Amino acid sequence: MIKIVGGIALGVALLVLALPTIVHKAGLHPEYNGEAVQLPAGKRALIIATNQAVLSAPGETTGDATGVMASEMTHPYYRFLDAGMQVDLASIKGGKIPVDPQTINRLLKTPEDDRFLADPAFLAKVENSMRIDDVDFTQHDIIFMAGGFGAAYDLGYSPVLAEKISEAYYASNEPVIGGVCHGVLGLINAKDRDGKSLIAGRRMTGVTDKQIKELGIIEITPQHPETELRKAGVIFESNTRIMDFLATLVVVDDEERFVTGQNQNSGRETAHRMLELVASKST
């Protein structure tokens, strides 16, 4: 009997140890190894993230800890940095960007997350991010909006962010604009010069309503990317799996100005596709 119990315990322990590998092979945080991009000196990227630290239901102020999903910030950060870019970090209010603690646990943590946790310069940027009001978006070649549940509370509600996205779109340097998962909510209120939706009629993606339901936050978070993008007139595209948490898709709009990723699995490819577009304009 003791041997049987011991065998079961060992099997459970081995399963727990293997879980990160299992979910990775199932589709979580897939590798993306496109052709290496190295940009000329002087190129700048701006990553925008949330200040929201509490997953609170409507009318409430308390709830579980939340924030940016680590990989949705770290994957693009290191892709841009390693391509030779200066990478700035901003948020709606400035100051600390909360990192959702669940997203740096053993099951979800990625090599880029480990690199971040040992990177004093990056950690300092997260603790003291720039306020978007104080950032000139037109001085950047890439503007990337990270997601995470926290972004559902502030990115889509910021008139300053919407205005600055519009300004960047019309800037002479034509920056590439994008984001992943809930980060795309930062695009929904951007306007063109006629006061109409800047993103209407464009092909885009973001986290699906299906995934939000599967994660159990459909009745908690105030905005849902698929719903809001469709309201803004976007031609919404997505992939689906038995669980959308394991799906991924990256969409480049026909004008090649916007690059959007479906969810946390899309950060590496989204960042790489943005780099490719910047590189194509630099030659």
Region spans (language model):
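Catalytic nucleophile serine of serine hydrolases
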Residues: 181-183
